[in-house]
Amino acid sequence: MPNYINYPSWLHPEVIQGIPITWYSLSYILIILISYKFIWYQIQSDNVDIKKEDYEIFMFSLVLGAILGGRLASTLVYDKSGIYYSNPWLILLPFDQHWNFTGFRGMAIHGGFLGAIIAPLITINTKLKNTNVQKYFLKLTDYGSIAFSSGYILGRLANFANAELYGRVMKGGIIFPNAEPFDTNIPGVKEFASSVGLEISPHDLLINLPRIPSQLIEGFFEGPVTFLLLWFLFKKIKKYDGFIFGVYVMLYAFFRFFIEYLREPDKELGFIITYKPITSLSEFSFLNISMGQILSLTLMLSGLIWIIVTKKIADKKIKNNTNLAYKN
């Protein structure tokens, strides 16, 4: 009996085949809409005095920063073809170098986090200076963390629809049509294929093996699990503004770091730190570290620094208010 699952033949990157609207693009549109509505809902629920027009300017800068940061990280860090260095306009355009429409093919969330902070910071110190958006910026980062995590899984579902970001070989896994096939002469490949019910003829040089659906696992933990922790646990123990955003960054980085062990390293990068070269299908080392894990460790440290800094800001405000009350 076959011990694997075939990738659904009816699932395609396009929502409707022949029409250049992809699940990936649709997922981002939905995540933006969910975040926009959910952040505004929290503002109203907590009676935070922010004008709608100021909020919309803030959200525009946040979305723009997240997209720019995500695209820059994806194209300049993960892509090693050099095409974006020689054709930098392709970073921001949904076309290839021959001007064929492709849509945006890649966003790196680590860069998205950075852009989602830098762009609004610039905006609140220019366009929105001396507004309540500037006053409540840290509170808005908390709201944004909760809102974004609630819709995050949609992006990973789109990755699954694209049959990308799949995991390592596993019995009972899914055979992704776009997965990198294995040379049948690699030690352990023929034995593994036989154990899951895949036949290899004497003339087969390559074979596609079942893999872990790591994009779905990432989506579950970095999306719903993180959202529930933020909404039902950390929101209740929050002591100061900015705390939830720092926790969110650390939670995301924590889950991402460990789930990366299940994920196939990026083909062009491989392992950034290779403690033990992989020469057979069964070999594995926790000390082989991918780019995603390095960036996740950096993100985790950034989240911790954010928590420490925002705690000092909160303590300073309390001290100033206490001194002011004492003088009065």
From Swiss-Prot:
Q: One Pfam family, short name please?
A: LGT
Function, as annotated: Catalyzes the transfer of the diacylglyceryl group from phosphatidylglycerol to the sulfhydryl group of the N-terminal cysteine of a prolipoprotein, the first step in the formation of mature lipoproteins.
Check the record and name the InterPro entries matching this protein. Answer: Lgt (IPR001640)
Which Cys residues form disulphide pairs?
A: none
Report the membrane topology from the UniProt record. Multi-pass membrane protein
Entry annotated with the keyword Ribonucleoprotein: no
Q: Where are the transmembrane segments?
A: 15-35, 57-77, 106-126, 242-262, 289-309
An example Gene Ontology molecular-function term: phosphatidylglycerol-prolipoprotein diacylglyceryl transferase activity
> Under which EC number(s) is this enzyme classified?
2.5.1.145
What's the family?
Belongs to the Lgt family.
- Stated name of the protein: Phosphatidylglycerol--prolipoprotein diacylglyceryl transferase
- Its chief place of residence is membrane
- Database matches in NCBIfam families: lgt
Q: Where does a 1,2-diacyl-sn-glycero-3-phospho-(1'-sn-glycerol) bind?
A: 156
What are the entry keywords?
A: Cell inner membrane, Cell membrane, Membrane, Transferase, Transmembrane, Transmembrane helix
Name of the encoding gene? lgt
Q: What GO cellular component entries does it have?
A: plasma membrane
Keyword field contains Cell inner membrane: yes
